[in-house]
Amino acid sequence: MPQRQPPGTEEGWYILHDFRSIDWDAWRDAPDRERERALETGTDYLQAHVDLKDAEEGASAVFSILGHKADFMVLHLRPTLDHLDHAERRFESTALAEFTEQSSSYVSVTEVSGYMHEELTDGLDDLEDEGMRNYMKQRIYPELPDADHVCFYPMSKRRGPDHNWYDLPFDERREYMSNHGDVGRQYADKVSQIIAGSIGFDDYEWGITLFADDPTDIKDLLYEMRFDPSSSKFAEFGPFYIGQQFEPSELSSLFAAEPLTSETGHGGADSQTSSESSGGRPSTDPSHDEIAAEDLESRLGRFGVDLEEYPAAGYALCFESSADAEAVSDEVDGLRENFDHYDTHVMTTVRAEGGETAAISLWKNERAATTASGFLGDLPGAAEGVGAPLDGSGDAATHGTDEDDEIRGELADADIYAGQPHGEDVYALVLYSEADPDELRDELGALAEHFERYDTHIKSAVYDAEVGGDRTAVVSLWDEKDAADTAAEHLSDLPDIVARAGEDEESGFGTMGMFYTVKPDYREDFVETFDEVGGLLADMDGHLETQLMVNEDDENDMFIASQWRDKEAAMAFFRSDAFRETVEYGREVLADRPRHVFLA
């Protein structure tokens, strides 16, 4: 049998999950002096490790644990196993250890694998993609989030007679992991994770630690993942632990059975502050002063940034620099690729005006912006930055504009979705090109591979007009308008781009389009029907142009783009009997539900 090549891995910090059970009988019987001494030494131990008195890098935290399996958990991340060994034995030397027993433990090491990037086989430092390299470093040198709750569980991949993970081809395993990651990315703004490998270290193959303010977000995430094939077919789980993070100073409250009420402050990817416990990574302490929103808006306007164009933004940053604009731009390009991995990122750009250069970064919330501030403050020649919350903005769940939502409602009333659930709408970036389609497809392939790393990307492909014209289009589908607009910066560099759909000055409503996947047996019939509908459209008042575009790689994947003088003219058609008949016909011939598209 052929020997399968395992995907490359890169390791970072070692992790010890140290679970402790309290001997409550001994604690109740102990004199006050002994209990005070135990709490004093225990608090000193925990605080010293949170403050990294034993190492230059890493992180530590403590959590109360619910249920019978443990009373509290001490979590250590350190550069070496020696550090963990010392931390574990150091606890046993405290007076507090006399009242506890190590009920369980888990040893692992943070890792990223070749499922994220094939070039990882050659090592993380050899990756040419700086954005991906920085993202992976954040995974293996993580900050502990300041979230209220934690969940830990170990897991392995199944090696049974019917389902053996390690017998699958690499491409199949990578596809499983990609789809699995798609589920997790839907919770990226609610749940943080640390993934660590433990083959040869402990009884399972991985240790998973999840952090969230709302514990039901953890439950919802894991529940949804159970239906993903990578879990339902191939995952085996160990015991689960759930608990609440607390400060070392609250140890006495834990032993007194009092509520743990203080706010944690360990810092994370979305936290407001970054404590000293997050060593070993670029500083993410805020490098900006907060100013009035109107003052910041005025400053951004001076550099040509209109905040009204970014309704999703909840916090804005501006860092002026004395360095050359090109040098700053080169640095920001790398940061932007890193920032784009987070759903809370809206936009980061470099602007130059009147001999002044500024890096401007917009985020959905202040916590994420504060972390970004630490990176932006390290830009060449950067002065101390300024930031401000943007009133009425920053809803991380917002997709599209109020006008888009109004259109969605009208389309739903007209049954345009042919039964499609609300909320599956997408944004399409459509660029027309005069280049050879084969050349376009080759150029787009490299970009599409880059886009695939982002959870908001749906697909990108080259389409030819089959009915209604002779243009070639590059189509890129995204969940969010801002993401599509960002993609436009890259796609506009494709060869011989001549126009962007929706930019026709005569068109007052260029947001309407439909994507269809047609059953192969009905393809020819569908095209003929489109011809008939096209004839009806040509006679309609307010209609400018409609084309049927076909994916060059899949002739059954089609895109209908319509341009109208105004929204009212378009909606008149969608309320017409002719369109209703078309929808009924579509229920029979479509392999998938049509998706309404807003042109970005």
Curated annotation (Swiss-Prot):
Which residues does the annotation say bind heme?
H180
Give the highest taxon in the source lineage.
Archaea
Q: Which Pfam families match?
A: ABM, Chlor_dismutase
Q: Which GO terms describe its molecular function?
A: heme binding; metal ion binding; oxidoreductase activity
Where does the ABM domain start and stop, copy by copy?
510-598
Start and end residues of each stretch annotated as Disordered: 261-289
Q: Which InterPro entries match?
A: ABM_dom, ChdC/CLD, Dimeric_a/b-barrel
Know the name of this protein?
Answer: Putative heme-binding protein NP_2262A
Q: Where is the composition biased (Polar residues)?
A: 270-285
Task: Give UniProt keywords alphabetically.
Answer: Heme, Iron, Metal-binding
Regarding protein family, the annotation reads:
In the N-terminal section; belongs to the ChdC family.
